[in-house]
């Protein structure tokens, strides 16, 4: 590895370019440190919204690994890991909120910080039921994660 330093958006672009042609969406890229080891964690979902399998993660990981090796965007040694979004599912686009309609989301941004059920989605606008009051935010202007796990795959 070389001494490049790359921000998460660039790492996300690299991962996206590698896995999107295979039918995957990159939801999130995080650089973490565990016990002195650097880990680049990539959360992916299937574009067809089917459950992510171990085979899917292997296929996405191999494709991205080749691209990360070619571009060498991370300084020093690191481990590239892939996982499905699971209970930590980031909600970054209106369609993510729409898919999880009725479930609770943890929302931060636009002067808000709350956990509430997703009530409605219209365009980029997402409405939540916050203690009986409708609160509408722009999906692209907030950070949100699923706060409860659905009882079935969505």
From Swiss-Prot:
Database matches in SUPFAM superfamilies: YhbC-like, N-terminal domain
GO terms of biological process kind: ribosomal small subunit assembly; translation
One GO CC term on file: cytosol
Alphabetical list of InterPro entries matching this protein: Ribosome_maturation_RimP (IPR003728), RimP_C (IPR028998), RimP_N (IPR028989), RimP_N_sf (IPR035956)
Compartments in which it is found: Cytoplasm
One Pfam family here: RimP_N
UniProt keyword list: Cytoplasm, Ribosome biogenesis
Gene3D superfamilies per UniProt: RimP-like superfamily, N-terminal
Family: Belongs to the RimP family.
Function: Required for maturation of 30S ribosomal subunits.
Name of the featured protein: Ribosome maturation factor RimP
UniProt lineage: Bacteria, Thermotogati, Deinococcota, Deinococci, Deinococcales
């Amino acid at each position: 590895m070389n001494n490049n330093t790359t921000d998460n958006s660039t790492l996300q672009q690299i991962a996206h370019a590698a896995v999107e042609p295979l039918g995957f969406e990159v939801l999130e890229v995080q650089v973490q440190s565990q016990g002195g080891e650097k880990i680049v964690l990539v959360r992916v979902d299937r574009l067809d919204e089917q459950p992510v399998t171990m085979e899917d993660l292997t296929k996405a990981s191999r494709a991205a690994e080749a691209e990360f090796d070619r571009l060498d965007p991370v300084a020093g040694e690191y481990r590239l890991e892939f996982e499905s979004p699971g209970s930590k599912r980031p909600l970054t686009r209106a369609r993510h909120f729409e898919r999880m309609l009725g479930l609770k989301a943890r929302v931060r941004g636009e002067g808000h910080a709350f956990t509430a059920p997703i009530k409605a989605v219209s365009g980029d606008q997402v409405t939540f039921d916050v203690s009986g009051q409708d609160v509408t935010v722009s999906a692209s202007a907030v950070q949100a994660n699923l706060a409860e796990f659905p009882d079935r795959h969505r």
